[in-house]
Design a protein with these regions (language model features):
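Hydrophobic alpha-helical segments at protein termini of multi-pass membrane proteins
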Residues: 1-219
Length: 219
């Protein structure tokens, strides 16, 4: 059975996340023992799961990197960088919000920043790998659902990119008007919808390719 492109990146991203989660959960347990508590066996299981995902992901990730190179060399290859750009924007805006103390943040992100670079760097790599891996995986799903010759094969990719844009767009709303959280959700929802539609319309206007997704033979 052929492993869909993007699986390696997903495994690497999830593996890093699990490996990073162990120390963070332990740190939370020390700070808030009444709210968060996990036994040593549980922490060990999380670490083993993360290492297993990481090893398996690194073993098959060359296929994903080759796929990315092929996608980036398309005339519209820039569009496949969007998941990475959204991750960078989300993290950057989150750090700005954290420095200003404007809103409640994801406790794992806040804790990773407070612990230091050793936690932030793996978190960023994990976030990027998960985002880009899922986007590539959605290209395969779209081809499987709709076939290689129809523009609708790009719909799952467009939807994933739209969903990923909710974070940075809602963060913009929180930075502009910190006291009105409803505005951030509204801005994120509207932007997410427009982002998905815009990406899908881009692909609909593109001329057909012999092998549009570079994801194996079209037959």
């Amino acid at each position: 059975m052929k492993i869909p492109p993007g699986t390696g990146l997903l495994l690497v991203g999830s593996g890093l996340y699990w490996v990073l989660s162990g120390p963070l959960i332990g740190w939370f347990s020390v700070l808030n023992p009444s709210q968060i508590h996990l036994s040593q066996m549980g922490l060990t299981l999380i670490l083993i799961t993360g290492i297993a995902c990481l090893v398996l992901g690194l073993w098959i990730i060359p296929t994903d990197l080759e796929e990315l190179c092929r996608l980036f060399t398309r005339n519209d290859g820039w569009i496949f960088i969007i998941p990475i750009a959204l991750v960078v924007a989300d993290i950057y805006l989150t750090l700005i919000g954290l420095s200003q103390g404007s809103w409640e943040l994801n406790p794992f992100v806040a804790s990773a920043v407070q612990i230091g670079p050793w936690a932030v760097v793996p978190f960023v790599v994990s976030y990027i790998a998960l985002s880009e891996g899922l986007a590539i995986w959605m290209l395969s799903i779209g081809k499987w659902l709709f076939g290689a010759a129809r523009p609708s094969r790009f719909m799952p990719f467009a939807l994933v990119c739209g969903a990923a844009s909710f974070g940075p767009l809602s963060n913009v709303g929180l930075l502009v008007i910190p006291g009105i959280s409803t505005l951030s959700y509204f801005l994120g929802t509207i932007g997410m919808t427009g982002f998905s539609v815009g990406i899908y319309q881009h692909f609909r206007k593109q001329p057909p390719y012999g092998n549009p997704l570079f994801l194996g033979p079209t037959t």
